[in-house]
């Protein structure tokens, strides 16, 4: 796998969970003998929702809710077969979305 690069993108609503998952990926791949760049924090996506509190009138009374999506990027340069195998066996939390590109 010489000259290849694996790019891993992590997304989660909880920043502590995504940081621990990124740390676990970096530790696993480093132990397997591959070079790792990252985790690089990408900009946090913020969605704000405005909801009217009352079902009938009082339109001026509103609630604002927000949802933040935290993102991290990890690059694995020249991955070894052992690193790829250990990456596939890694157990991560369900609330972390993982995208892997070769």
Curated annotation (Swiss-Prot):
GO terms for molecular function: structural constituent of ribosome; tRNA binding. InterPro entries: Ribosomal_uS10, Ribosomal_uS10_CS, Ribosomal_uS10_dom, Ribosomal_uS10_dom_sf. GO terms for biological process: translation. Keywords: Ribonucleoprotein, Ribosomal protein. One of its GO terms (cellular component) is ribosome. SMART domains: Ribosomal_S10 (SM01403). The keyword Kinase does not apply. It comes from the Bacteria. HAMAP family: Ribosomal_uS10. PANTHER family: 30S RIBOSOMAL PROTEIN S10 FAMILY MEMBER (PTHR11700). Involved in the binding of tRNA to the ribosomes. Belongs to the universal ribosomal protein uS10 family. This is Small ribosomal subunit protein uS10. It comes from Beutenbergia cavernae (strain ATCC BAA-8 / DSM 12333 / CCUG 43141 / JCM 11478 / NBRC 16432 / NCIMB 13614 / HKI 0122). The gene is rpsJ.
């Amino acid at each position: 796998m010489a000259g290849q690069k694996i790019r891993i993108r992590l997304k989660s609503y909880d920043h502590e969970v995504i940081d621990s998952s990124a740390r676990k990926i970096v530790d696993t791949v480093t132990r397997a003998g591959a070079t790792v760049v990252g985790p690089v924090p990408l900009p946090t996506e913020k969605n704000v929702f405005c909801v009217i509190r009352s079902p009938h009138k009082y339109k001026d009374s509103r609630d604002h809710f927000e949802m933040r999506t935290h993102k991290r990027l990890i690059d694995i340069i020249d991955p070894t077969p052992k690193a790829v195998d250990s990456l596939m066996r890694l157990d991560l939390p369900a609330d972390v979305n993982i995208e892997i590109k070769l």
